[in-house]
């Protein structure tokens, strides 16, 4: 027999909460917008959330550091169904967002597996510890059973600056398919939920050729001397 005689946090409603908590319905949002990852969804609806997709930046190409209120990625606590989610094993050592910190990999959780996301946009270090200085993100997973949810997303960038064709065209093609299904376990409300997601993201190139000479017949000293004479 286990008797609970105390708790660090008392139960309260949204009205009793002294700090703002954003509740994001991922199922409804996914049906309205093109956001396909947790970072993109939170960037779209949470004003204090920041996540930037990195390029040519070691492991942060796949693990996008996320932050709240402009603080470090290691100061954001991520919970899964109210339980603490572990940090990733990647240390940001390049000149990217959150250099020197260790963030939580939100991309490891498919958006199709999430029912809603709760974002506490204030410090909660007194309750959760120093890794909640910036705020807390609680991800609530789906609990549905005997129901198949299938989602397909596709898109691309259409621009005259695309170098795929001489006159412009499309690049950055993106395709994602995800599925979620749950099964009942036993007769006491148990269940198991499966989610799979596959994404293919193409490259985007906005570079152009340089149409002017890099080196000229005049060296730096001659050019500076000419300016000195002109303004003398």
Could you describe each region identified by the protein language model?
Residues 146-149, 163-232:
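Transmembrane beta-barrel wall of Gram-negative outer-membrane proteins
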């Amino acid at each position: 027999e286990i008797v609970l005689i105390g708790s660090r946090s008392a139960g309260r409603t949204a009205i009793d909460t002294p700090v703002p908590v954003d509740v994001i319905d991922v199922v409804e949002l996914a049906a309205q917008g093109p956001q396909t990852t947790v970072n993109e969804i939170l960037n779209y609806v949470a004003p204090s959330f920041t996540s930037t997709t990195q390029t040519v930046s070691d492991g942060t190409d796949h693990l996008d550091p996320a932050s709240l209120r402009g603080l470090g990625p290691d100061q954001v606590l991520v919970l899964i169904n109210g339980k603490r989610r572990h940090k990733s094993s990647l240390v940001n050592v390049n000149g990217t967002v959150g250099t020197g910190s260790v963030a939580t990999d939100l991309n490891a959780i498919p958006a199709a597996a999430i029912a809603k996301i709760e974002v506490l946009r204030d410090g909660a270090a007194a309750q959760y510890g120093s890794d909640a200085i910036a705020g807390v993100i609680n991800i609530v997973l789906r609990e549905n059973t005997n129901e198949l949810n299938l989602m397909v997303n596709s898109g691309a960038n259409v621009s005259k600056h695309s170098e795929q064709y001489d006159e412009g065209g499309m690049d950055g093609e993106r395709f994602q398919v995800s599925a979620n299904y749950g099964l009942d376990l036993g007769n006491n409300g148990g269940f198991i939920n499966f989610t799979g997601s596959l994404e293919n993201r193409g490259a985007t190139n906005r570079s152009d050729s340089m149409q002017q000479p890099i080196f000229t017949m005049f060296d730096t000293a001659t050019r500076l001397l000419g300016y000195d004479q002109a303004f003398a």
